């Protein structure tokens, strides 16, 4: 709620954004009982796939990933969007890390799928490496990346790929990489050459991202992704378009960053 409500204040909108608990498989019923005052929703797991199934229209990112994290009321029903892709793209672009020839994605869940689509937008000629423990999900993610025109393959160790990649995107939740981070500590001479985006942001820097910051390399917090995917949602809620910037968007971003930092 902090990001949205901060932005509403800057934009002068008399809107409110609040957290609502909806049970698994209960999203359609919840939406059907709403009055017209409700303009849109952010959707978190495990409801993203349910949202994808019942919306009346979807943006390309939602179609590709099979997941909807944003619902917006329209004249013809509910539109579904995936703004996680935009969040990753903008977080990386604003970090200005240079060319992306090789990108390593850690994980194989919904966020990893969004990361693959984001890589295609950032650098369609990039080679994508996938590291994940679930062999079936890892193979499915590699196949998905290839199906949308990327070069992709699995890797079975982090040491060399993580050092050489221009960008490492960890899509795992906080704490999931603690064991791997400990291994990196034991690998004498581990010196990453590129940047890292860790979607886990509490605490920050994460133990995983610290290996990059200690080497003087760019580290991108999951808060940056969170902020930019929310900016896309705000664009959708205000004028139904994720691509057109908000009025005074620079001031909105500055206010949101200040709120998150404090």
Question: What are these language model-derived features?
Answer:
Residues 97-99, 120-124, 183-193:
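Short, conserved loop/helix-junction motifs that constitute active-site signature segments
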Residues 82-85, 92-96, 100-120, 132-133:
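Glycine-rich adenosine-cofactor-binding loop
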Residues 1-96, 203, 211:
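Phosphate/diphosphate ligand-binding glycine-rich loop within oxidoreductases
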Residues 124-148:
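NAD(P)-binding Rossmann-fold cofactor-contacting core
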Residues 121-127, 215-218:
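Conserved S-adenosyl-L-methionine
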Residues 199-262:
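Adenosine-phosphate binding glycine-rich loop
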Residues 146-220:
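Rossmann-like adenosine-cofactor binding region
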